[in-house]
Swiss-Prot record:
This is Syntaxin-132. Residues 297-303 are vesicular. The lineage of its organism: Eukaryota, Viridiplantae, Streptophyta, Embryophyta, Tracheophyta. PANTHER family: PROTEIN SSO1-RELATED (PTHR19957:SF307), SYNTAXIN (PTHR19957). One of its GO terms (molecular function) is SNAP receptor activity. GO terms for cellular component: endomembrane system; plasma membrane; SNARE complex. The gene is SYP132. It comes from the Eukaryota. Residues 204-266 form the t-SNARE coiled-coil homology domain.
Length: 303
């Protein structure tokens, strides 16, 4: 990213920063202005990379949980996932704080010579900040997708457990009640009498542990969503602003191109008009000469 933004501001070969300062009224080199800014951007992107790594760990743990049939195993996975989600919350808050600082820094930077609103430096900073915020929003969306997946897969697992124990598929009301309360012993009363209490109680304990895990994980993921909400609003607003700027630039470019085309056509018409005027004058002169010759008839005088 550093190369992408700083290459546009490199001095011409053979030139010196001092000469540039004199020509620009002792303004700072734009590439120097961006160096500190890009370090802050890199720090935020490093945090986003950590969020991505934690997201993958949570997705893997969620896949593992589908095959678990023991309460203690489910509890161990839950503890791992809770630890990772807590870490996600910590990193997300850090990232949000750094983005807020970046935006404040962008505003204060506009007070520097040559860095005012709309300048090349200002546009680069704004666009880069917007891109970083967009990445954070995308990661936020990924965590919410994970939350929905955990909830749906929990429902699927509960249905399978009831079917495995009872031999019949539960209706939606039964599944909803299990998801809401986690209490399944009453549903398995007949199976307990037929298969024995010990074996069924393992399934009951696993369903209860899974219920508690999903409830706690969902609560933590909802807390994450709140952390990102303000940022999402800012990203959308800045996205609209950047789109408007791009639209205005595109419209201005189109108008300029139309103007150039019209000017070229006018020059072409003017050139053609002059050419035909010359032809008309020559033709008129020829006609005049013919008339004069016809009137004077110099060949008769000679005779």
């Amino acid at each position: 990213m550093n190369n992408l933004l700083t290459d546009s501001f490199e001095l011409p070969r053979g030139g010196s920063s001092r000469d540039g300062d004199i020509e620009m009224g002792m303004q700072a080199d734009p590439s120097d202005n961006l160096k500190g800014f890009l370090k802050k951007v890199d720090a935020i992107e490093s945090l986003i990379a950590k969020l991505t790594n934690l997201l993958h760990k949570l997705q893997t743990a969620n896949e593992e949980s589908k095959a678990v049939t023991k309460a203690r195993d489910m509890k161990a996975i839950k503890q791992r996932m809770e630890k990772d989600i807590d870490e996600v919350g910590k990193i997300a808050r850090m990232a949000k704080t750094k983005v807020d600082e970046l935006e404040k820094d962008n505003l204060s930077n506009r007070q520097k010579p040559g860095c005012g609103k709309g300048s090349a430096v200002d546009r680069s900073r704004e666009q880069t900040t917007g891109a970083v915020k967009k990445k954070l929003k995308e990661r936020m969306d990924d965590f919410q997708v994970l939350r929905e997946a955990i909830r749906q897969e929990y429902r699927d697992v509960v249905e399978r457990r009831v079917f495995t124990v009872t031999g019949s598929r539960p209706d939606e009301e039964t599944v909803d009640n299990l998801i809401e309360t986690g209490r399944s012993e009453q549903i398995f009363q007949e199976a307990i009498q037929q298969q024995g209490r010990g074996q069924i109680l393992d399934t009951v304990a696993e369903i209860q542990e899974r219920h508690d895990a999903v409830r706690d994980l969902e609560r933590k993921l909802l807390e994450l969503q709140q952390i990102f909400m303000d940022m999402a609003v800012l990203v959308d607003a800045q996205g609209d602003m950047i789109n408007n700027i791009e639209t205005h630039v595109s419209n201005a470019t189109n108008h300029i191109q139309q103007g150039v085309s019209a000017l070229q056509n006018a020059k072409k018409l003017q050139k053609n008009s002059r050419k035909w005027m010359c032809y008309a004058i020559i033709l008129l002169l020829i006609i005049v000469v013919i008339i004069v010759v016809a009137v004077i008839q110099p060949w008769k005088k000679g005779a």
